Amino acid sequence: MYSFVKEKCENTHILSCEILEIENKYNIIFPTILKEYYLKHNGDKIQLCIFTVDEEEFGVAKIVELKYGNCSFEKIVKNDREDGFIDEHLYPLARNEGGDYFYWDVRDENVYMIYCDDVENPVWVCGSVEDFFDLMEVNQDISVM
């Protein structure tokens, strides 16, 4: 489905009911494209994807796994809410090589980059998770393939 998926990981498969469980727990609805990604690729390794938006370069090194990873969706949300730095309407989507996270907004699906050293100033990346995946799809770093 996505050419940026590099390698299938074992023991990370999830079911629709697990997605629904998390949606109910947080009172959110994942965008359809994100649900489809999780069902097919939860935890899979991806190519580094580098793209530029408004003269700022972004790199995507990993899509946050919904479950079963060291830095899974729920672990990140728990830490974010405990720390109180990330707005409650933002949920983790991906991260860059430096450990900074991309978040999607449940209110309008906009995607933002939040740098660890500047959490007060989210940087707008694109208007939807689908746009984010499109940016990744056409901007893979083929030098590391």
Predicted feature locations:
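A surface-exposed partner-binding patch
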Residues: M1-D100, S143-M145
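Short, well-ordered, mixed-charge alpha-helical segments that flank or form enzyme active sites
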Residues: D100-Y103, P122
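Short acidic-glycine loop/turn motifs at beta-strand connectors
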Residues: D105-D108
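Short, solvent-exposed aromatic-acidic interface loops
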Residues: C116-E120
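Compact, glycine/acidic-enriched structural inserts
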Residues: N121-S143
